[in-house]
């Protein structure tokens, strides 16, 4: 049950901890164990509050202009703010979100007016295990937005993970990764992990974050088709807080010396820790389990 506070917040308990939904008018910001996780504008879900989600929207629009239909895989569900926005902006699209927390995956439909399947399906499981179960060339875009205590899980940033993402993407598809940088995290190593699988790479970030002056988000865009950098740059300049694209020689210079993340060698007991455990179920099964 939710319990309201004088600040206009409500609190819920899920498998991974406590969720606070903090309301500011129609905007609901979701915190998981005190860490800002999602924000939904309930009056107009197409409005994206988080800057990195605005960057992801620009990156997608540069290749697949709205309202073009897409099929998207979202690794990391939380409150499904980005799938909801894209479902609103692109009617007829199909979104699959993967959330590792069964309680959270089921509860977000009670908290927010999310589209039902097939517009938006929510699957419970490990992001990599679910992606590895997908057929080749299934998606136009894959979004990786997964964090555990402020860090991207190790098995979701390796060369092997990038290889699986390329397999599941269509030939003209986009791989969008929300990376942490600064404060002990290095997005440049994530870019290095993508190089063997994706020929077109760029990053979007605040210049201060790029210089490691402060911790922040870096959105990495990966593709194997000619990516319209100029169009992306034009769209980013229209945002309330314009962002900078780093690509080509500038990206090579920024990432110089960065070493890719590798999966551990498989042991005789089976797949290494970085692969993650396959623990998936449909949202319907998850709902029945909670009933």
Report the location of each language-model feature.
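SAM/dcSAM-binding transferase cores
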Residues: 2-23, 37-45, 62, 211-291
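The AdoMet/dcAdoMet-binding core of the Class I SAM-like
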Residues: 12, 43-167, 184-185, 291
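A generic structural signal for alpha->beta connector loops
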Residues: 18, 92-94, 117-119, 172, ...
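S-adenosyl-L-methionine
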Residues: 31-32
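A short, flexible beta-alpha/helix-coil linker loop
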Residues: 35-39, 147-150, 175
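Residue-level preference for alpha-helix termini and adjacent loops
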Residues: 39, 111-113, 151, 155, ...
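C-terminal substrate-binding/active-site "lid" region of AdoMet-derived donor-dependent transferases
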Residues: 162-229
């Amino acid at each position: 049950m939710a319990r309201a506070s004088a600040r206009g917040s409500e609190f819920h308990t899920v498998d991974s901890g406590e969720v606070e939904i903090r309301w500011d008018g129609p905007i609901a910001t979701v915190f998981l164990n005190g860490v800002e996780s999602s924000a939904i504008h309930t009056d107009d879900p197409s409005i994206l509050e988080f800057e990195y989600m605005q960057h992801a929207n620009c990156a997608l629009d540069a290749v697949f202009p709205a309202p073009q239909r897409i099929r998207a895989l979202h690794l990391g569900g939380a409150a499904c703010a980005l799938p909801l926005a894209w479902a609103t902006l692109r009617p007829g699209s199909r979104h699959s979100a993967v959330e590792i927390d069964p309680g959270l995956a089921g509860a977000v439909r009670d908290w927010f007016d999310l589209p039902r399947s097939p517009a938006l399906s929510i699957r419970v499981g490990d992001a990599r295990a679910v992606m590895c179960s997908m057929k080749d060339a299934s998606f136009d875009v894959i979004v990786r937005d997964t964090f555990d205590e402020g860090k991207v899980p190790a098995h979701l940033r390796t060369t092997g993970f990038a290889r699986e993402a390329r397999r599941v993407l269509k030939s003209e598809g986009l791989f969008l990764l929300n990376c942490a940088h600064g404060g002990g995290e290095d997005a440049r190593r994530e870019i290095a992990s993508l190089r063997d699988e994706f020929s077109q790479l760029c990053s979007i970030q605040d210049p201060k974050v790029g210089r490691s002056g402060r911790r922040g988000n870096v959105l990495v865009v990966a593709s194997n088709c000619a990516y319209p950098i100029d169009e992306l740059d034009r769209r980013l300049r229209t945002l309330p807080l314009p962002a900078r694209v780093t690509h080509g020689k500038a990206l090579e210079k920024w990432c110089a010396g960065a070493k890719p993340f590798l999966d551990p060698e498989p042991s005789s007991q089976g797949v290494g820790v970085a692969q993650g455990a396959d623990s998936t179920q449909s949202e319907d099964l998850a709902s029945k389990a909670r009933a």
